[in-house]
Amino acid sequence: MTSPLNLTPTDWLARLSRQHDVELPRLKALNDEYELRSARSYMHPEIFREIGDRLQQVVIAWAQLVVDSVEERLDPEGFRLPDQDSGDDDLWRVWQENDADENSQLGRIDALVMRRSFVCVGTNEADADTPLITFESPLEMYADIDPRNRQVRAALRRWVDPQASPSLPSAPQMITGGGGVKYATLYLPNSTHWFENGIEQDRDEHMVGTVMVAPLVNRSRLTDWLGRSELETVLPLVHAANKIATDMMVAAEFVALPIRGLMGLSPSDFEDSAGNKLTAIQAMLGRFVAIPDDDGTGKTFEFSSANLDNFHQTINQLARLVASIAGLPPHYLGLTTENPPSADSIRSAEMRLVKRAERKQVPFGGAYEQTMRLVKRLQDGDWDPRYRRLETIWRDPSTPTIVQKADAAVKLYNLPKPIVPLRQTREDLGYTDAQIARMQTEDTKAAAEDPLTQIANQLSARPGSLSGAAA
């Protein structure tokens, strides 16, 4: 039970809207960093005045790399109770019918980038046995956490339909800025309310006693249950790398080509053999004719082109710092050596990344388990105490691909003394109970058709065969 506040739904709407508005600027900034829309950093104003719109910042996608490298190793494969040999097929059915296989990936990315995301559960009028599961962005949703038990006390989702025309007076406390109709969904322990332009339009009195929202929080702390972004620690280095890469392109524009000068000549003297004036780019590339002055003493000189190695070395050093902070293998950031790495060295380099993924499975799995407990509550009409121990089944993050997973499972089974039986191997490969049952039927059929098995069966069925052989 959460600590109740004596607030009306309208009061909750205003309270959560204000709290959400405070965080929105930072959440949008983090989202822009992931989408490679970051602002220019460490750039001198004189460069902007000199180059103007010709300067396009070079953006290195390290922010996406840091997030995606972890998320690619987070794959839920089912839910089960500790005393069950296999996963709960019905919960997995609800998960898949809500397209949670695809949408949960989006929720994990948002949580890693913007500190948290949310999973919402609701009643399904079309099919009461399949409650609705949706994944929501922190840009649209906010939850109030009870400081006593750290459970969700209320949650609010706000969004705007820019294509619709407002038919009711607007409510500035809901969403600031933008045109169109402003909608909101308010989640309370015993009811869900829908608002349009600040006026309640409908409600669902589900009487569950718990807010039907499970926060997916990344890197929460004891005093900060709203989480932190995976990008917080690497953004200064990413900005520095973007600045160095941009400086390198500016240097390539102005000083990467040799600069040639001529003494005793004016710009009008640059002509080709036909008497045509040379363009600036032709002169810069050296395709010009040197014309001496009246006394024939025209002289040419040349400045050597700039060496860009210092930019390369700086970017490589920043890449090493990002790899060490984010726990990424060096080859993820393009850092290689002359000697190709061995398979063992690659696995060793990925150990910290694997451990980071395993750490993420604990809080993210807890949110998914709470989601499925809410699903079970809507299905049965009451709480099942057994589901307090529900577990999320995750794919092994050290074998993120199907090929790696199959190789590991088959090796465990093909040992001289197998560590796991055949059924467990098939479960590790991700086959469902129905698929495993069909495989076992085919195994039995194949064994019955085996010639040696048929001969053995005939001998064992022949009357007195053993006694005759003994005689």
Where are these regions (language model features)?
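Long, compositionally biased
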Residues: 259-260, 267, 350-369, 375, ...
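Long, highly charged low-complexity segments enriched in Glu/Asp and Lys/Arg with interspersed Ser/Thr
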Residues: 424, 429-460
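C-terminal amphipathic alpha-helical
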Residues: 102-115, 119-120, 250-253, 307-403
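Extended, helix-rich architectural segments
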Residues: 1-135, 146-150, 457, 465-471
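Charge-rich, acidic-biased intrinsically disordered regions
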Residues: 16-17, 24, 124, 128-129, ...
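Short, amphipathic alpha-helical "recognition" segments used to contact nucleic acids or chromatin
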Residues: 406-416
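Extended, charged amphipathic alpha-helical segments
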Residues: 5, 201-348, 390, 401
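Extended, regular secondary-structure scaffolds
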Residues: 118-230
